[in-house]
Curated annotation (Swiss-Prot):
This is E3 ubiquitin-protein ligase bre1. Residues 1-58, 274-306 are annotated as: Disordered. Keywords: Chromatin regulator, Coiled coil, Metal-binding, Nucleus, Transferase, Ubl conjugation pathway, Zinc, Zinc-finger. The lineage of its organism: Eukaryota, Fungi, Dikarya, Ascomycota, Pezizomycotina. It is found in: Nucleus. Pfam families: BRE1, zf-C3HC4_2. Residues 210-263, 309-561, 594-691 form a coiled coil. E3 ubiquitin-protein ligase that mediates monoubiquitination of histone H2B to form H2BK123ub1. H2BK123ub1 gives a specific tag for epigenetic transcriptional activation and is also a prerequisite for H3K4me and H3K79me formation. A zinc finger (RING-type) spans 708-747. Its EC number is 2.3.2.27.
């Protein structure tokens, strides 16, 4: 049956024209994911080629027309679509297109919401990390020994519970409930420690305290405004991002609308949708051209909602600007009144006004006190100089006296040293004589010891000789006995006697051997004693020669010592005379030394007292100078702070003005965007109501088309590459597992890699 074209019908009503625009086929968007076309599915196997005009400027129009044709052809090919009448396909395509556009809108909203959720999750994690870092820092600081040491240095907590001084908060966020709740558990410890620190700090003048309080208030206000500004800037940035996204979507939609209204797109749609199957194509194409031309023209009635939307936006912006202008006028009036008051006060300031201030009075009293102290210090300085001159003269006289006494003492000590040297020489001579006598006695004792040893050796030799002589006597006695026995007849001697004689001869032989050994030892001892005597006599001769030489030297030393002794005796006599004279001088010097020591003790006491007084005066002088320097530094610092605060106030006023202008501009933009958002929401609700009015039957028909033709249970989501038919994934996998790998519609075989997932 012939298929009716999907081109919109021209109408003078703006709502009907927009409804027809919504029923246009969805174009391919780079940001949206379009369903896979049959051409794309078959191009995987290499069965199709790119369009020859793909690189031309009108490729977007080709994509639109090809997308429509592909969707319709694919749906008709896979499901065997047959239309009973010409009205049904137009309605089904329109509903499909509307559903598709709604799905794309949902996808875009989903993407934007996911992006916002991602940003919010990042911000939440960052804030959680900041809070975690703050908690860990507090736990580390309050749990460490540093705070304990500070508490010990500050003293016990009971001492300061009575009068606890208040301290200025650098934040002053007393009106923020969340901040108070977050720090409620930690506020007691923080306030306790900070109040104790503030109490132990030195008290400053009331002017400085007032300036500090004003500075703290200004800083708190500045931080509050900065926080509000950051909040407004973040909201502005979010609104700008949403505005950019909305404008981008609006531009894309406008571009799609222009493409859908073009005559070329209508012709291509007619060519690809109807094709050669439609015999009455000329009349339809003529009607399509007329309708597209009528759609291309913009009637006057279509401008109504756009003008209303712009009018509402401008009205909201103007109302917001009026409110802002009224606020600015009131603020300017208040500021002008304050400026005039301040100018009047500043122009009327005189010297009396400055003189009546507390700061001037304090500085005046400090100046008078410093002048009095300086005059007193000058008078004491003159007295101390005079006393120093007197002490110097006394010190020079005492130094001269001490020098004379030391010279006399040195001369006396030198005389004593000379006497000690003479005594030392005499003692050394006596020591040498004693050492020589000792050596002589030692040599005599050694000679006596050697003589005794030699006598003992001779006695041992004599004993050995006696033993040898005794053995000789025994031998001779035995010989005499043998001689007597041999006088008898030897033939008559029996064997036993011969044996006894033999034994006697053996004993005689042994005795001869012992006699020979004793004689050998005696001869050896005699020879050793003789050689030792010869060496001893030679050593004695050498010793005698050495002793004679030493004796001659000792005689010479003795004569020299005697001469020096006579000279020393003369010196001793003279020194004794001098000693008797110097004893009187020493007694006099001791008396004068005692007097000088008492005088020196008195002078040292006076010097120590004057030094203490001088040190105290110098310390006071340094303290006053330091106090003056500190006061000057404090004054300069306060002047610098005043100048800095002035410059800071001017810069903050400029930044506040710029930020307020930026906030006003952002508020106007927000109001305009809110108005446009309300209008777009209204138009969206209107179009939703129009599009979803009578779509129950078409929805059921589309649902039956989207169901699988085999199981009638699941939706079609898997396409077979070899033939292009679409079934559900369960049916395809069931065919693969049962090894009946053929298409249910055309019985064409397919393998494990011959099917793909699609999205309708």
């Amino acid at each position: 049956m012939p298929v009716a074209e999907a081109s919109p019908v021209a109408s003078s009503e703006p709502g009907f024209v927009k409804m027809e625009d919504r029923k246009r086929a969805a174009t391919s968007d780079h940001n949206d994911s379009a369903p896979p076309l049959k051409k794309q599915a078959t191009s995987v196997n290499g069965g199709s080629k790119p369009h020859p005009d793909a690189d031309m400027p009108w490729k977007d129009d080709l994509e639109v027309s090809l997308g429509l044709a592909g969707v319709v052809g694919f749906m008709s090919f896979q499901g065997g679509l047959r239309y009973p009448s010409s009205a049904e396909p137009t309605t089904s395509l329109t509903i499909k297109d509307a559903i598709w556009r709604q799905m794309q809108e949902y996808k875009r909203e989903k993407v934007s919401l996911e992006a916002k959720l991602k940003d919010m999750s990042k911000a939440a994690t960052r804030h959680n990390e900041h809070l975690r870092v703050i908690d860990t820092w507090y736990n580390q600081v309050c749990g460490s020994t540093l705070i304990d040491e500070v508490k010990l240095l500050l003293g016990a907590a009971e001492d300061i519970k009575g009068d606890r001084p208040t301290f200025q908060s650098s934040l002053s966020f007393d009106d923020v409930d969340n901040f108070e709740k977050h720090l409620k558990s930690r506020s007691n410890d923080i306030r306790d420690i900070i109040s104790r620190l503030v109490k132990n700090t030195p008290k400053s003048p009331p002017e400085i305290c007032e300036l500090q309080s004003q500075l703290a208030k200004k800083l708190a206000e500045e931080k509050a405004t900065i926080a509000e500004l950051d909040k407004a800037l973040s909201e502005k940035q979010q609104l700008e991002e949403s505005l950019e996204e909305a404008s981008l979507r609006y531009m894309v939609a406008e571009k799609k609308l222009d493409r859908a209204r073009s005559l070329t797109v209508a012709k291509l749609e007619k060519q690809y949708i109807l094709g050669p199957q439609r015999p009455g194509g000329d009349s339809a194409s003529g009607q399509r051209e007329e309708q597209s031309v009528s759609n291309g023209a913009t009637p006057s009635a279509e401008r109504g909602p756009e003008l209303d939307e712009a009018h509402n936006k401008l009205v909201a912006i103007s109302e917001k600007q009026k409110e802002q202008l009224q606020k600015l006028e009131t603020e300017n009036a208040n500021l002008l009144s304050q400026i005039t008051d301040l100018n009047i006060k500043r122009s009327k300031l005189t010297d009396d006004d400055y003189a009546h201030t507390d700061l001037f009075k304090q500085m005046r009293s400090q100046y008078d006190d410093v002048v009095k102290r300086i005059n007193h210090l000058e008078a004491t300085n003159v007295q101390l100089r005079e006393e120093a001159v007197k002490l110097r003269s006394e010190r020079t006289a005492y130094r001269n006296q001490v020098d004379e006494e030391t010279q006399n003492v040195i001369a006396e000590k030198e005389a004593q040293l000379i006497r000690a040297e003479t005594d030392l020489a005499r003692i050394r001579n006596a020591r040498d004589e004693l050492l020589a006598d000792q050596q002589m006695r030692k040599a005599a004792q050694e000679q006596e010891k050697t003589a005794v040893l030699k006598v003992q050796e001779l006695a041992e030799a004599r004993n050995a000789q006696i033993a040898s002589l005794e053995s000789e006597v025994e031998r001779l006695r035995l010989q005499v006995e043998n001689a007597k026995a041999t006088q008898a007849d030897s033939s008559d001697i029996p064997v036993e006697e011969l044996r006894g004689k033999y034994q006697v001869l053996e004993r005689q032989y042994a005795m001869l051997n012992t006699e020979l050994t004793s004689m050998q030892t005696a001869c050896k001892k005699y020879s050793t004693l003789a050689s030792q005597k010869v060496t001893d006599f030679s050593a004695l001769e050498e010793k005698m020669a050495r002793l004679t030489a030493e004796k001659s030297k000792a005689d010479q030393k003795y004569f020299a010592a005697m001469k020096s002794k006579e000279a020393r005796d003369l010196e001793v006599r003279t020194l004794r005379m001098q000693n008797s004279k110097s004893s009187d001088i020493v007694s006099q010097l001791k008396e004068s030394e005692a007097a000088t020591r008492s005088l020196l003790a008195n002078m040292e006491k006076q010097v120590s007292e004057t030094k203490e007084a001088l040190n105290s005066m110098m310390n006071k002088h340094h303290a006053t100078q330091q106090q003056l320097a500190e006061n000057g530094i404090v004054i300069e610092g306060l002047k610098g702070q005043i100048n800095e605060l002035k410059t800071l106030s001017t810069s903050k006023d400029a930044t506040l003005a710029s930020t307020s202008s930026a906030c006003r501009q952002a508020e106007t933009e927000i109001e305009g965007l809110k108005a446009t958002l309300a209008d777009t929401k209204k138009s969206l609700d209107n179009w939703k109501n129009k599009s979803l009015g009578n779509s129950s039957s078409e929805y059921e028909m589309l649902r039956t088309l989207a169901l699988c033709t085999v199981c009638r249970r699941n939706f079609k989501n898997t396409a077979i590459k070899t033939c292009g038919h679409v079934f559900c994934k369960d049916c395809v996998e069931e065919r693969l597992t049962s090894r009946s790998r053929k298409c249910p519609n055309c019985n064409r075989s397919f393998g494990n890699n011959d099917y793909m997932h699609i999205t309708l």
